[in-house]
């Protein structure tokens, strides 16, 4: 039987998640600043009101992940700065 993984208002700044199965996990109000996710299965996970500042995600499964109301400043996924990508996409959309 699958165990539900819920992180509620946890202070996990600088945490390292390696080779974890966190599919469908719920992160609510969690501080994940400077955290590292490496080889982690996150499909279907939900991140709400979280701090992902300067977090790094490498070789992660992000299928159907939801990130709402989050600080993503400096968030890097597979070497890509997410906030910069969003800013560039918004600029392209307004110039069309």
Task: Locate the predicted segments by residue.
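Tandem repeat scaffolds
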Residues: 1-96
């Amino acid at each position: 039987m699958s165990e539900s993984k819920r992180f509620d208002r946890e202070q996990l700044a600088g945490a390292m998640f390696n080779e974890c199965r966190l599919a469908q996990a719920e992160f609510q109000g969690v501080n994940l600043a400077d955290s590292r996710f490496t080889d982690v299965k996150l499909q279907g996970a939900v991140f709400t009101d979280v701090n992902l500042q300067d977090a790094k995600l490498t070789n992660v499964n992000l299928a159907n992940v939801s990130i709402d109301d989050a600080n993503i400043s400096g968030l890097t996924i597979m070497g890509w700065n997410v906030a910069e990508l969003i800013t560039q996409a918004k600029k392209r959309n307004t110039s069309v």
